[in-house]
Amino acid sequence: MTLKGKKVTVHDMTLRDGMHPKRHLMTLDQMTAIATGLDAAGVPLIEVTHGDGLGGSSVNYGFPAHTDEEYLGAVIPKMKNAKVSALLLPGIGTVDHLKMARDLGVHTIRVATHCTEADVSEQHITMARKLEMDTVGFLMMAHMNSAEGLVKQAKLMESYGANCIYVTDSAGHLLPEGVKERLSAVRAALKPETELGFHGHHNLAMGVANSIAAIEVGANRIDAAAAGLGAGAGNTPMEVLIAVCSLMGIETGVDVAKITDVAEDLVVPMMDFPIRIDRDALTLGYAGVYGSFLLFAKRASAKYGVPARDILVELGRRGMVGGQEDMIEDTAITMARERGV
């Protein structure tokens, strides 16, 4: 199957998912420098919020260096061509957060739920459509639901008014075959005018391969991050994805050299540690654990003397999902007690 001439919208995650490894402490200068670089490189859509979305500032998820309003207010006025998006998780973000984002100039809102809980998104998706925003339903941890199950959840979000549905590999656990199975089923079930997106993580080094697999079965929005900056081993590395798309004739509108420069000159120097597939990030992908659990598990490991890898495997065995960050320490305490540490 040739993908030459296929047009894809690349959606940058550096300034939202990338907040996880930065412990949500990016400065306004870092945000604006990277955002303007992405804009100049031709990236059409850039996500800006706390790593856990609008309203994420909390004891549970971490306190950011600045408020969502401050980050959005700094970035949006500097954009020449790119539009800015925001993530919202019902139960963390509220309708008031949604209205605030719209008033600041946010173009796209992505309403995210666990892949079996789309029904909690109705209020937020409905309001976003009333506000005439580009409205995305974002189904997280997609490996934990079957293709048939994802179809039901996607159709719920579509019925609430979402004009794009994302299948999200939050754990970086899926392989290309699993991506194709899920996205092809969702694509066939949605209205032709409803867009389809894919969000990948690189914990098994499958980010680019899975993104191409998604494009093959009809996805036209693809998430990626410069230098892969994101939870776990990072998101699909954008500069690599753009280069591969260029070689395949997939049209992204993003300049290969410019996005590579953003990654190398702006993002890599900002990293607090290398974003790579270490033993713990690999365990996230292998065990199917939510990507942002990584730093929480490492902190619990240092505190209780249980290897982070063992904590992550146990979290996977228990089926923990995004939003249960408080259970990581509880799990580590239980394991330490059982081991007599």
UniProtKB/Swiss-Prot annotation:
Annotated InterPro entries: 2-IPM_HCS-like (IPR050073), 4OH_2_O-val_aldolase (IPR017629), Aldolase_TIM (IPR013785), DmpG_comm (IPR012425), DRE_TIM_HOA (IPR035685), PYR_CT (IPR000891)
GO biological process per UniProt: catabolic process; L-leucine biosynthetic process
Entry keyword set: Aromatic hydrocarbons catabolism, Lyase, Manganese, Metal-binding
Domain Pyruvate carboxyltransferase span(s) in chain numbering: 8-260
One Pfam family of this chain: DmpG_comm
EC number(s) stated in the UniProt entry for this protein: 4.1.3.39
Reactions that this protein is recorded to catalyse: (S)-4-hydroxy-2-oxopentanoate = acetaldehyde + pyruvate
Site (Transition state stabilizer): R16
Active-site residues from the entry: H20
GO molecular function, one term: 4-hydroxy-2-oxovalerate aldolase activity
Binding sites annotated in the UniProt record for Mn(2+): D17, H199, H201
Residue numbers binding substrate: R16, D17, S170, H199, Y290
Stored NCBIfam families: 4OH_2_O_val_ald, PRK08195.1
Family the UniProt entry places it in: Belongs to the 4-hydroxy-2-oxovalerate aldolase family.
Listed name of the protein: 4-hydroxy-2-oxovalerate aldolase 2
Organism: Dechloromonas aromatica (strain RCB)
